Amino acid sequence: MSALNSLPLPVVRLLAFFHEELSERRPGRVPQTMQLWVGCLLVILISMTFEIPFVALSLAVLFYGIQSNAFYTKFVAILFVVATVLEIASLFLIYKWSYGEPLIRLIIAGPILMSCMFLMRTHRLGLVFFAVAIVAIYGQTFPAMLDYPEAVVRLTLWCIVVGLYPTLLMTLIGVLWFPSRAITQMHQALNDRLDDAISHLTDSLAPLPETRIEREALALQKLNVFCLADDANWRTQSAWWQSCVATVTYIYSTLNRYDPTSFADSQAIIEFRQKLASEINKLQHSITEGQCWQSDWRISESEAMTARECNLENICQTLLQLGQMDPNTPPTPAAKPPSMVADAFTNPDYMRYAVKTLLACLICYTFYSGVDWEGIHTCMLTCVIVANPNVGSSYQKMVLRFGGAFCGAILALLFTLLVMPWLDNIVELLFVLAPIFLLGAWIATSSERSSYIGTQMVVTFALATLENVFGPVYDLVEIRDRALGIIIGTVVSAVIYTFVWPESEARTLPQKLAGALGMLSKVMRIPRQQEVTALRTYLHIRIGLHAAFNACEEMCQRVVLERQLDSEERALLIERSQTVIRQGRDILHAWDATWNSAQALDNALQPDRAGQFADALEKYAAGVATALSHSPQITLEETSASQAILPTLLKQEQHVCQLFARLPDWTAPALTPATEQAQGATQ
């Protein structure tokens, strides 16, 4: 700890980031890492034995292809086969009409690249077109490196083998031999979330970061999609299992902030918590067995009062409704998403994005051809790889690519100088490469925030030490050229994406926040009664809120990187946005607490009370996008009926009023603390 205290704050944050990424717990990560690791070693063995070129490309196919579960791996493998056919066909089309004419070759390749980049952003199968764009650009380097058309055709045909045999390999490893099923990962993930919930129910623990809670909720939703596609039993009882996922997400996120020491430590409360934990354990056992949980648990009037006293009644009701739900309830028909985005042909940003990518590639091609430096052709690949929809995400990808390339180049340099002279056979080579590939595979299976570092590190290492050589290599020039090519491509892309039609999310962020707050207002309009339809609707909208707040948080992180914006305006926007996100999360949890008390109120009173909050929040959200929102002020009517029934509800709603008052004033020139207390709120 003392050593960390002496380091600069940015370094400490970077180390904390990598510690979080490398230690991430995710069902299926270990099997995916092992599949990727074994696949890399087999690719090296096969390529070296049969002298198959482009080892780095084969490794890239593995890193992009092996996914977290067997169904997803099979789906990506099919896409890769289709992409290989399309990309080789496009290359032969280009070579046939323009092999000896670089200008004509670029004129033909340009529209192909633009079409692929356009479809990558607008089509559901964007990954296919991304692969075609990569090969279309990479193939332009073949005629420049070789003077014989026959050799170029032979290399292009080798690309079919290079793309398809790793695809076959990952299908055998990840789908047939050692499959990691989505249903197994879902059972493990649900039980892990319930374990965390029980820990917070029984012990006083520090709450986990809200971003982690939201990512876990999104991960469960993604697994649910794979389970629906891959498991027949899950599809048959999908309505119950989707309710189970929503219930577990609600219990996990609610108990994350639960502190048992905040309530009276009476014997009745202790026994009730133990009983609740016992029911959660029964749910865990049913999930492990893959069975729909059915419970005959009922809450007596005294237990209901105890649950209300310790703010656990709503959790009990969600468990009760799940345990009493018919497993054969027919699911709600899901709407089929369109293959193209709605504004694909009306939004000019998509075509501008394709033009910017082509412009960056042409600049790099002109540069490395003009200086006659073929070794830096990776600059063209970099322009395609780091091309992202907006400035912030492009900068993030550039940092990841540069970081991965730097680590890969350092490893390649050390490997060439210190290890290569001592190697005599393929077995020794595989033993030395094993820890490098294992490290790259573990990083590549982390979250999207850092996974590309592992992929780029292994690919750069292979480009410098294993590419097109089938024996010991001591050429340090390859390491230098590959790293410089990536740096040049990164610099060119940064300039193009910053100054040519920059797509800033600074205008989109307030709209995103307004959408999240609008969803929160919908939650407040749901009747706060323990009725099946209302409670299920509440749980599903609540999951949508997790996704909305997480998307806003990620967008804030990208806007921070948009250096083309005025620094003061950017800082003010980020500060206000983060305040809205933080207060929105607090308001959601505070509103949860009112459910434990509001159900005892008369139904005629409740909608009017909840409507005050929803109206105020909707009015505030409508002005966020136009920077015309003031902090909401709410006046609560303290009727004698409400005071007589449940005085604690007034305190809970007053707390919500206080959180409303802390929402930032978007009309002020700078953020200032709220000086006026919200009406109806107490200190």
UniProtKB/Swiss-Prot annotation:
One Gene Ontology term from the biological process aspect of the record: response to antibiotic
Keywords from the UniProt entry: Antibiotic resistance, Cell inner membrane, Cell membrane, Membrane, Transmembrane, Transmembrane helix, Transport
Main subcellular location: membrane
Pfam families with a match to the protein in the record: FUSC (PF04632)
TM helices/strands, residue ranges: 43-63, 75-95, 100-120, 125-145, 158-178, 402-422, 426-446, 457-477, 483-503
Membrane topology field: Multi-pass membrane protein
Subcellular location: Cell inner membrane
Gene Ontology terms for molecular function: transmembrane transporter activity
Entry annotated with the keyword Transmembrane: yes
Family matches, as InterPro entries: PHBA_efflux_AaeB/fusaric-R (IPR006726)
Assigned GO CC terms: plasma membrane
Family to which the UniProt record says this protein belongs: Belongs to the MdtO family.
Subunit structure of this chain's protein: Could be part of a tripartite efflux system composed of MdtN, MdtO and MdtP.
Database matches in PANTHER family: MULTIDRUG RESISTANCE PROTEIN MDTO (PTHR30509:SF9), P-HYDROXYBENZOIC ACID EFFLUX PUMP SUBUNIT-RELATED (PTHR30509)
Known role: Could be involved in resistance to puromycin, acriflavine and tetraphenylarsonium chloride.
Name the record gives this protein: Multidrug resistance protein MdtO
